[in-house]
Amino acid sequence: MVTDQGDRASEADGGPVRHIPVMLAEVLAALEPAPGKVILDGTFGAGGYTSAILDAGADVIALDRDPTAIAAGQPMVAAAGGRLRLIHSRFSELADHVPEGGLDGIVFDIGVSSMQIDEAERGFSFQKKGPLDMRMSAAGVSAADVVNRAKVSDLIRIFGFLGEEKQAGRIARAIEKRRAEAPFETTRNLANLIETVTPRKAKDKIHPATRVFQALRIFVNDELGELANALFAAERVLKPGGRLVVVTFHSLEDRIVKTFFQDRSGKAGGSRHLPLVTARDATFTPVGKPMVAASEDEASRNPRARSAKLRAGVRTPAASPGNDLSIFNLPELASLARLGG
């Protein structure tokens, strides 16, 4: 769970980070775990939320696409005495593991975990020499595949949209020139090039490579698409009165969650660019404020919490209107399948 741009620097720069569940008190207050309830933790990670939910008396189904997290969580499974199922799966596929309308609550903690950042061989950090990988699972296209094979125009879009990198064009063209001489293989290869092309200024709070590495990670793991589809899946498997709680650390992720809850509130009214939306019954009603940020005290103790935002909703009995990814206005980027070669 990396933090937002300047606030992300400590994790994105690769410094050791002890896993502390972000906004744990707020998550539990919104989720309301209790004996007899079944809660799904869609992003198990180091198990911080799962542990607290179990302590509250609820049973837990936990998912993670990272096999390393699944292996590390086995002692917790053993200690839970049958109250915890830990499944190797993307959270967008959660409906494959639970019956429709069968859950009392779902929590998502979006982003990369501190465990992944700390392992140089995973290739998430540019301050640790490792393979240019960034995959949350062992399968699929790596960051090296993207950097070495994508068209310059595609790299510009990836860096510009997913990383909000203002120097996307300059960096992409430098990558094209460098890879013609030798392919990028390590995190240092790429980080050093970016730092040469866009040197760090004294006023800069983050390393010049932060946004590009962020963009590559989001792209390689299709994090925005995964989140959007996970929200739709959550809507199908929550029972009436069930609660969906989502913690995000980046404006792109938060925008998707905000859009989803607005669309499902039955109050979405279109915009100057889109026609008015036909009114329909709400499938979610808000829990408390539309958005809750981490407290100043928590942010001072845990830098990862500085950009955290929590949004939550309660499932109504209304039928799901179905999956329509167009509501999120996601960009058209290069195909991961094509880059796999």
Curated annotation (Swiss-Prot):
Keywords: Cytoplasm, Methyltransferase, rRNA processing, S-adenosyl-L-methionine, Transferase. It is an enzyme of class 2 (transferase). S-adenosyl-L-methionine binds at G47, G48, Y49, D64, F91, D109, Q116. Pfam families: Methyltransf_5 (PF01795). One of its GO terms (biological process) is rRNA base methylation. Its EC number is 2.1.1.199. It comes from the Bacteria. It is found in: Cytoplasm. GO terms for molecular function: rRNA (cytosine-N4-)-methyltransferase activity. One of its GO terms (cellular component) is cytoplasm. Disulfide bonds: none annotated. It catalyses: cytidine(1402) in 16S rRNA + S-adenosyl-L-methionine = N(4)-methylcytidine(1402) in 16S rRNA + S-adenosyl-L-homocysteine + H(+). Coiled coil: none annotated. Residues 292-318 are annotated as: Disordered. Specifically methylates the N4 position of cytidine in position 1402 (C1402) of 16S rRNA. Belongs to the methyltransferase superfamily. RsmH family. HAMAP family: 16SrRNA_methyltr_H (MF_01007). NCBIfam families: 16S rRNA (cytosine(1402)-N(4))-methyltransferase RsmH. This is Ribosomal RNA small subunit methyltransferase H. It comes from Sinorhizobium fredii (strain NBRC 101917 / NGR234). The lineage of its organism: Bacteria, Pseudomonadati, Pseudomonadota, Alphaproteobacteria, Hyphomicrobiales.
